[in-house]
Every structure is written in C-alpha cells, then in structure tokens.
C-alpha cells in the first residue's frame, strides 16, 4: 500500500541532519585536538582541556586547533560545492518529468552512504581527511537542499488548492521546529551517553529507515508524468528551464524587473550571512572563554531552533498591523543586534541571552519569499522558485566556505570578528530593503499582482 505523505520522510531527515551536524563538528574537533598534540579530551567533558588563561600553554594550542578545524571544514565545504550545485540543479529540474521520488531517493542514498562512512571512520579511527572524499562523493547524489526541494515540490503537486498547500507547508515548518529543537537538545546526551560511534550509527539507521519508506511506501506524486519520461531528454529539460528563466525577466516591465532583482538580491545576501555564520557558533562555543561541553552545545542548538516558532508567530501577529517589508526590517535588525552581541559574549549566561535577538531570524526569509511570489505571474512561480533554489544552493555552500575561512584567519587575534563582520554585512540587505520600499512606493506596491487580478476579473465578466 502506497502512502501519499512525505511528512515522515522530512521528520526523519531533519532528525538525522540536526544530530549529524554537531556530531561531525565535535568529532573533527576532538580528532584534530588529539592529532595536533599530546593532549586528550575526556568523553564526559571538554572543559578540562579548555584553557581560559592566556598564559597557559594549552591556550595557544587550542587557538591552533580552532584554526585547523575551521580550515578542515572549509576544505569539506569546497569539496562538495560543485557536485552539490550540479546535482541539485539536475535532479530537481529532471523531477518535473521523472517524478519527485527520483531526487528523494538519490539524496537519501548519498546521505546514508556518508553517515555509514562516518561510523566506520570513528570506529576504526581512520584519517579524517577521508571525510573530504566522502563529502565529494555524497554531494554527487544531491544534498539537503535537493532533498527539501523535492519534498516541498511533492507537497505542491498534491495540493491543488492554495489554502490546503499553505496548511501543509505550515505543518512542515512546525514539524521542522519540533524535531530539530528536540534533537538539538538531546545531541549532547547522545555524545556523552553513547559516544560518537553509536551516535553516528543511530543517524545511519534513521536514514536507512527513511530510504526504505521512500522506496517501498511513498506514493509518487506525478503518476501522469511516467509517459513523458522517455520522450523528454535531459538536454531538452535544461533548454526549457533556461528558456523559461530568460523569458521570466524578458517579459517583465522595467519596474517589475528592478523590483524582482532587488528582492532576489536582498534575500540572497541575507541568506548568505545567516547561513554562512551558523556553523561557526559550535566552534565559538567550544573555544575559551566559554569552553562549552557537548550538553551545553545541545542546549544552544535547541534554543536556535526556537526561531522557527517565534518567526512564524511574529509573521502571524505582525501581519495584522504592518506591511511585509516592515516585518523583514524587524527580522534583519534584530539579527544584526544578535550578531553584534555574540561577538562580545564571554559567559554562558550571555551566550544563552544572545539567542533572544535571533527570535525573528527566519522571518525575513519567509516574508521575502512571499513578496517575490507577488511580483511574478502565477504561471511563472515554479521558474522563479527554481532560480531561488539554485541561488540558495550556490550561496549557502559558498557562504559556509567563506565564513570558515574568515574565522580561521581571525580566530587568533579576535574570535568574535566573524560575528561583527556578519552584523556589518547585514547592513546590505537592510539598505536594499530601503531601496525596495522607495521603488515600490513610486511604482505601486506589487504592481503585477494587481494587474493580474484585474485582468482575471475582466476575463470572468
């Protein structure tokens, strides 16, 4: 019996990714720490080997470890950049004809293989440089962006009514927040109670169950497209996609082109900063003067997941009293404040308190997606969001690589520099929002949507 629900797939995937991310970072940190010198880290805590006194010999040693870890993360991110970008573009564009299960299966196989390799790597204490090769090979099968893109496309295929689609997507956001929050909260206890090998094995089992569900139980959302699979080649698929993208901007008026490009630029720059700096939090928390252990890192990860709930509540409440662009301003400004506060956080209490300004971090992304959907025709929504997914994949991988490189170069003389830089860079989307406000006020807000609705009313008459 086939099941037409992709929600269990997303829940298992979010659990695996949320648990695997801090596991991998802390495992690499411990391995590089032990390989760089004669110091070792007890599994129960890392605070015994984290020096807060700058005159201590361990202090200079841990600065070197921080630099090596961030450089290693940079190498891993770069190794998966090109194959991840190409595979995401190829698999998602092909799914319009080949079905949504195709990218879901491939990306799940890649994630499963990578997780199984981490189990072997940690069990046999193999050289961690092999992680770079496994990241490259795994990216050939797609990445997490590929998986999520196919999952949301699966939901869109099923939901013909806009209201039903909104409810399903809202449920996904809710599940994403719940699963990632609970997993982040428990990740430290997984490491402390089970160790790295068993923790990686749990991730592998979750991904294996996920793959079995997709292969045997998940119903394909595009049954009618099976007859088109032979007649439509990959070359034609690429040509059609590029042609639709070209026509999307060619057919728009000058004002619409300007507004659309500004919205895309604003969203990608904001996405670049927030995604790029997010992996640095774990390294920052492991280093002095915080010297967090795995449990505290899990608490911090769980608090970071609260932003999914708070941003959703913020949009729901603010939508009654302000425009979309004002909500984007609030989210950008509060995130900017949070970045600046993080740069000067020197105690555990302060590091927990800096999570408060990040409560609306996701809000600008959701609002900007909504604004983008309002400036293009209903028949061009798919093409626009395909472009957006491509830019997010490119920007996300590039951002993580860039910020890891910056942190590696600056950790010795200013640990919080990368967060101060992030706060400054957020001025770019803030200024861009001001320009959007000015342009939309002069040309009329969401001109195309109004014209489209009026033309539909005229045709109905």
From Swiss-Prot:
InterPro entries linked to this entry: MFS, MFS_trans_sf
Topology in membrane: Multi-pass membrane protein
Extracellular membrane side: 26-70, 125-133, 192-195, 283-294, 346-347, 404-415
GO process terms (BP): vacuolar transmembrane transport
Subcellular location(s) per record: Lysosome membrane
TM annotation in the entry: 71-91, 102-124, 134-156, 171-191, 196-216, 262-282, 295-315, 325-345, 348-368, 383-403, 416-436
Residues on Cytoplasmic side: 92-101, 157-170, 217-261, 316-324, 369-382, 437-461
Main location: membrane
List of glycosylated residues: 38, 46, 53
One Pfam family matching this protein: MFS_1
Signal peptide: 1-25
Catalytic activity: estrone 3-sulfate(out) + n H(+)(out) = estrone 3-sulfate(in) + n H(+)(in); 25-hydroxyvitamin D3 sulfate(out) + n H(+)(out) = 25-hydroxyvitamin D3 sulfate(in) + n H(+)(in); cholate(out) + n H(+)(out) = cholate(in) + n H(+)(in); glycocholate(out) + n H(+)(out) = glycocholate(in) + n H(+)(in)
Short sequence motif Tyrosine-based lysosomal-sorting motif: positions: 446-449
GO cellular component: lysosomal membrane
Keywords recorded for this protein, A-Z: Glycoprotein, Lysosome, Membrane, Signal, Symport, Transmembrane, Transmembrane helix, Transport
Molecular function terms, GO-annotated: symporter activity; transmembrane transporter activity
Family: Belongs to the major facilitator superfamily. SLC46A family.
PANTHER family assigned: LYSOSOMAL PROTON-COUPLED STEROID CONJUGATE AND BILE ACID SYMPORTER SLC46A3 (PTHR23507:SF9), ZGC:174356 (PTHR23507)
Function: Lysosomal proton-coupled steroid conjugate and bile acid transporter. Preferentially recognizes lipophilic steroid conjugates or bile acis as endogenous substrates and seems to mediate escape from lysosomes to the cytoplasm. Modulates hepatic cytosolic copper homeostasis, maybe acting as a lysosomal copper transporter and sequestering copper ions in the lysosome. Delivers pathogen-associated molecular patterns to cytosolic pattern recognition receptors as part of the innate immune response to microbes.
Name used for this protein in its record: Lysosomal proton-coupled steroid conjugate and bile acid symporter SLC46A3
Gene expressing this chain: SLC46A3
